[in-house]
C-alpha cells in the first residue's frame, strides 16, 4: 500500500510517500520559521495561509522524487489534530479533495501518534511494549505503549510543555525564535554550576511534570543579573545551561520512574525536543545503567513531518480504518481515545 501523508498541524508543511513494502519513498518539508520569527512565535492565520501556498508544490515534489503518479497512490493520510484549527483544515481539505478526485480512502492521523511512531521508520525500530516520552512544544507526556492505539497515559505536564518552556524562557532572556535551539546553542558555552535551577515535581511521587516555575525562575535569575549590571552573553549562556540541565534531569528522573513502575526496559523519545542532544545523552546514560535501550527518530523526523503521518496512517489503513468524506479536524484530541489496531 502506498500512502501519501500530509502534515499541517502548526508551522511546518510536510508531505511524504510511504510504501508498506518498500518503506519511505520520498518526503519534503517547508518550515515557516522565518515567516514567524519577526513575531516571536507562530501566528495562526499566517500559518494557515502559508500551508495553502506550499501544499501542492510539495506534493508535486514528492511525486516527482518518488517517480510516482496520482494513479499509484492507494490512500491519503493527513493530520486531523491536535493543532491549530485553521492549519489542520488546510491539510484535511486537501486530503479529502484528492481522495475524492483519485477515488482512494483518506484517514485522519493523530499528530502525537505520528511522533510516537516516527522511530518505526528507522533501521532498528522499537518493539512493543515500551514507554514513550512525548516531548514537544505542545505536549509533555509519558505513555505506556502496548501496540498501535493501545496507549496508557502515565503522566503529563500540568502546565507548560517542555518545548513551550524552552521557547518562553528564551524569549524572557532576550533570545530569538525558535527558542529551543537557541537555548541549546548557548548552553554549550555555559559555565556548569554557576546557577542551579530546581527540578520541579521530582521531590514527590508521581509521573506528572510542571515547567512553568522554571520559566519564572529563569526570568528572576536574569533580572537579578541585569540589576547587578551583568547582562553579558556569558550570563545568558550560563542561564541557558542551568535551565536546560534542570529540564533534562527532570525528564530523565521521570522516565526512570516510569520504566521502574511498568517493568519495561525500552524507552521511545519523540517530538521536537527529542532532537536535543543533552536530553538524548541523559536518557542514554540512564538506560545504560538500567540495561535498557532508548529509541528515537533521526533529527529531521523529530520535528513535524509528513513521513510520520504517512507511516501512522498506513498502519491504520492496513487495519481497515478510514474516514468518511466529511472534512473534520480535532484541535484537542486525547491520544488514549484512539482505537487499537
Curated annotation (Swiss-Prot):
What Pfam family is a match for this entry? TsaD
Q: How is the cofactor bound?
A: Binds 1 Fe(2+) ion per subunit.
SUPFAM superfamilies named among the record's database cross-references: Actin-like ATPase domain
The reaction(s) annotated as catalysed by this protein in its Swiss-Prot or TrEMBL entry are: L-threonylcarbamoyladenylate + adenosine(37) in tRNA = N(6)-L-threonylcarbamoyladenosine(37) in tRNA + AMP + H(+)
Annotated Gene Ontology cellular component terms: cytoplasm
**Which superkingdom does the taxonomy of this entry point to?**
Bacteria
Residues holding substrate: 134-138, 167, 180, 276
Q: Which GO terms describe its molecular function?
A: iron ion binding; N(6)-L-threonylcarbamoyladenine synthase activity
| One of the GO biological process terms | tRNA threonylcarbamoyladenosine modification
Please provide the record's keywords in A-Z order. Acyltransferase, Cytoplasm, Iron, Metal-binding, Transferase, tRNA processing
User: Which family is annotated?
Assistant: Belongs to the KAE1 / TsaD family.
- What function does this protein fulfil? Required for the formation of a threonylcarbamoyl group on adenosine at position 37 (t(6)A37) in tRNAs that read codons beginning with adenine. Is involved in the transfer of the threonylcarbamoyl moiety of threonylcarbamoyl-AMP (TC-AMP) to the N6 group of A37, together with TsaE and TsaB. TsaD likely plays a direct catalytic role in this reaction.
Question: What is the name of the protein in this document?
Answer: tRNA N6-adenosine threonylcarbamoyltransferase
Give the taxonomic lineage as stored in the record: Bacteria, Pseudomonadati, Pseudomonadota, Gammaproteobacteria, Pseudomonadales
